[in-house]
């Protein structure tokens, strides 16, 4: 509602605006809300939860794996120890792509063979991270749509398995 009020106020001032101008106003207002609510020092902050577990989920093809590589690089640049878990055991080349990222960034990758249980990979990743005193764990998962019940249930299983090692995991989804 806050964004709608701001847009209405700006539109009232200008009276007649084009759809391009409205688009620009909308982008500016969204940016303002995001920037006002995010302190740069807190962005991607892990707090005191170590290892801080981030479970990366989303639909197919949105860049989850690439984002994990970039987040791993960010956290490593802050001097944190990072580990990646390759729990997307479904997509061909997902594990290979993470291997490239982990080598490029210089972080450890926990993986199993294609078709392995993603919850098992997640558990092994967190167990290894605890044993090696890792600060941040990034777990890649297969793309999924909300209407695919079996894949949504798989996320629940991953969460339950992670919580056997850390009751607060995952800390971010």
Spans of features found by a protein language model:
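Primarily NTPase-proximal linker/entry elements flanking Walker-type ATP/GTP-binding cores
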Residues: 1-89, 94-114, 122-130, 134-141
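Inter-motif core of Ras-like GTPase G domains
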Residues: 81-83, 107, 135-136, 152-173
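Conserved ATPase-coupling elements of RecA-like P-loop NTPase cores
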Residues: 94-96, 146-152
């Amino acid at each position: 509602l806050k964004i709608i009020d701001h847009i209405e106020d700006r539109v009232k001032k200008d009276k007649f605006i084009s759809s391009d101008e409205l688009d620009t106003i909308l982008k500016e207002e969204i940016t303002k809300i995001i920037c006002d609510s995010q302190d740069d020092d807190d962005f991607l902050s892990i707090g005191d939860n170590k290892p801080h577990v981030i479970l990366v989920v989303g639909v197919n093809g949105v860049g989850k794996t690439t984002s994990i590589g970039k987040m791993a690089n960010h956290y490593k640049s802050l001097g944190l120890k990072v580990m990646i878990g390759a729990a997307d055991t479904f997509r061909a080349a997902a594990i290979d792509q993470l291997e490239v990222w982990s080598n490029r960034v210089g972080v450890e990758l926990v993986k199993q063979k294609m078709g392995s249980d993603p919850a098992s990979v997640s558990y092994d990743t967190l167990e290894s991270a605890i044993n090696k005193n890792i600060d941040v764990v990034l777990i890649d998962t297969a793309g999924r749509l909300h209407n695919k019940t079996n894949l949504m249930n798989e996320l629940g299983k991953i969460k339950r398995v992670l919580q056997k090692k850390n009751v607060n995991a995952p800390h971010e989804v």
